Structure formats: structure tokens, C-alpha cells
Design a protein with these regions (language model features):
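Transmembrane beta-barrel strands of outer-membrane/channel proteins
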Residues: 14-20, 78-82, 123-129, 168-176, ...
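Surface-exposed beta-loop-beta
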Residues: 83-152, 160
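Short loop/turn motifs that connect adjacent beta-strands in outer-membrane beta-barrel proteins
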Residues: 8-11, 73, 115-123, 158-168, ...
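Outer-membrane beta-barrel "beta-signal"
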Residues: 276-290
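Outer membrane beta-barrel
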Residues: 1-85, 182-186, 196-222
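Residues on the lipid-exposed face of transmembrane beta-strands in outer-membrane beta-barrel proteins
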Residues: 1-5, 64-68, 109-113, 151-155, ...
Length: 290
């Protein structure tokens, strides 16, 4: 539930209400990342919500967002949302919209650059700060405030001269969060998406992506100490959980998209500190638009 309008000038847009902040910030506006099924790609880098009060759809919070266009290519976005960890995923509090359980305020700021042409692109540089007091990892003490920064890129790198609409886009994601209180220290993502892979399939896509989630070294120290105190061996794990994903978006009808998908997860126990076999995941996404 939100209200949005331009204010004073067409360049200034304001949005107020109870809303998911990830709908306006932290992701690529082009929607390229939702050619994948894994939430590590589709949405925003996972360490934003994993290590701060950032919330993505369907979780909503009270807040305000301001966008200002410096030019057709450059835009600044600033927002402020209340942080309420008890409301995330708690259906019993779905209609408790007040700020009673607020622990702080998360303030993101984004600089956005977009250019059109034969090879269009979108670039986002962002920073966020959560004022909540939270427990410091590996300590009984608390830390006042936690933040992070990110860089998101979507750039067309090839366009067919013989088939209109056949374009290859490359994307990149980098996000770093505070090591004092975030279980994720860094997230890296990269990949390509080919639009119109076949002449008779103008709205189909082929997407290939790689993601790497790096656990906080402090969390690993805590796990190693717990294993030592218990007299057990700590597994010889890499320092990250990794993801490789391949998907095909099939536009069956103007309103129905089918997305068969294959994912390979490398070291899925990197965050829990347990030795788990690599996992092969096969899925199918069905998306209907009315």
C-alpha cells in the first residue's frame, strides 16, 4: 500500500507507504536477472537482506523513496525504511503496520546510469546503512549500525545485424556487507542472457549465470572453535558457496512463460560449516501474467 507521484517537477518522483524496498532499489531495472530462478540472481544480492534490515518482496515495511533525474541518463535514488525483523515472513503480523517493533532505519542511496542505442546498458552504484543495534558475530557485544555497498551492471555486448531483437547481454553483481554482523561478507555474480535465441522465438531467452556467496570469516572462526571444543574435526571446506545456473525462457503464449532450469550448487554446506555433497537441481518455473 503506497502512494507515488511527481512533485514540483517531472524530474522528481516521490513514493510513500508500506512497500517492499527491493521493488525500487538494489536490483537491475531491466529485469535481466529474473531470467533465472535462483533468488541469488533474481532480486538483489542476498547479503543485503542477510546482513541488514533490507527487505525484498513480499516483505513490506513503512518507508519513503525519492528519485531525481539529473538528465535522461543519470538518476539518484534515496530512501528510508523502518527495520522490523519480527515482521519478516510472519503471517500473523501481516496487517500490523505500525512501527511498534522497529529496531532502526535502513537508508539506501543509489546512483543510476542508463544509456540507450544499439547496445543499451544500465549501471548502479549503491550504499546502504542500517542503524539497528545487533549482536556482533563471535561476541556477546553489540554493534551499532551496519552497512554495505554494491555495484550492478547490465550491458548489451552484441546485437545481430540480420535479426532484429537478437541481443546478447552480459551482467555483473558485486556486493559487500559489514563483517561485524553479516553472515555474508561478499556476493559475486556474472553471466549472459541471449534474447531471441531462434528466429521463430522472438520472446524466448537463454540464460547462463555464476554466483559466489562468501561467508563471513568471523562466522567460520566461531564454527571452527565450536568443533574444537566438541573434539570434532572441522570439514575442509572452500571459503564460498557457488552456483551455476542455466535456464531457457519459453514464451508459450502472450501470457504464459515456461522456464526449465538446471542449477549446480557447489559446497552447499559452506555457511553451516558442514560437509554436504554438491547438489544438482532441476526445476520448472511457470509464470502467468493476467
Amino acid at each position: 500500500m503506497s502512494y507515488e507521484r511527481t512533485l514540483f517537477t517531472p524530474a522528481l518522483n516521490v513514493k510513500l507507504g508500506y512497500m517492499a524496498m527491493g521493488n525500487d532499489l538494489g536490483g537491475l531495472d531491466s529485469g535481466i536477472l529474473c531470467n533465472f530462478m535462483n533468488a541469488g540472481f533474481c532480486g538483489h544480492p542476498l547479503n543485503m537482506s542477510g546482513g541488514s534490515g533490507w527487505a525484498n518482496y513480499p516483505n513490506a515495511h513503512l518507508g519513503a523513496r525519492v528519485k531525481y533525474d539529473f538528465s535522461p541518463a543519470w538518476q539518484l535514488r534515496v530512501a528510508a525504511f523502518n527495520v522490523d525483523p519480527s515482521s519478516n515472513g510472519n503471517s500473523s503480523r501481516a496487517w500490523h503496520l505500525g512501527p511498534k517493533h522497529t529496531t532502526g532505519t535502513v537508508v539506501p542511496i543509489e546512483l543510476v546510469y542508463k544509456h540507450a542505442g544499439t547496445l543499451p546498458g544500465e549501471y548502479k552504484l549503491g550504499y546502504y546503512y542500517d542503524s539497528s543495534d545487533v549482536k556482533r558475530i563471535g561476541s556477546n557485544k553489540t554493534v551499532s549500525g551496519r552497512g554495505g555497498h554494491y555495484l550492478l551492471i547490465d550491458q548489451a555486448v552484441w546485437s545481430s545485424s540480420t535479426s532484429a531483437g537478437r541481443v546478447l547481454h552480459a551482467f555483473g553483481q558485486y556486493s559487500a556487507a559489514s563483517e561485524a554482523a553479516s553472515p555474508f561478507s561478499k556476493w559475486y555474480g556474472a553471466g549472459v542472457v541471449l534474447y531471441k535465441p531462434f528466429e521463430g522465438r522472438p520472446r524466448d531467452t537463454v540464460a547462463l549465470g555464476y554466483g559466489r556467496a562468501v561467508p563471513n570469516p568471523r562466522s567460520r572462526d566461531v564454527q571452527e572453535l565450536a568443533a574444537f571444543n566438541a573434539g570434532t574435526d572441522y570439514p575442509n571446506l572452500n571459503n564460498a558457496e557457488q552456483l551455476i545456473e542455466l535456464s531457457y525462457g519459453y514464451q508459450a503464449t502472450p501470457w504464459l512463460t515456461l522456464r526449465p532450469d538446471v542449477q549446480y550448487i557447489i559446497e552447499p554446506g559452506a555457511f553451516s560449516g558442514t560437509e554436504i555433497d554438491n547438489a544438482l537441481v532441476v526445476g520448472l518455473q511457470v509464470k502467468a501474467v493476467f
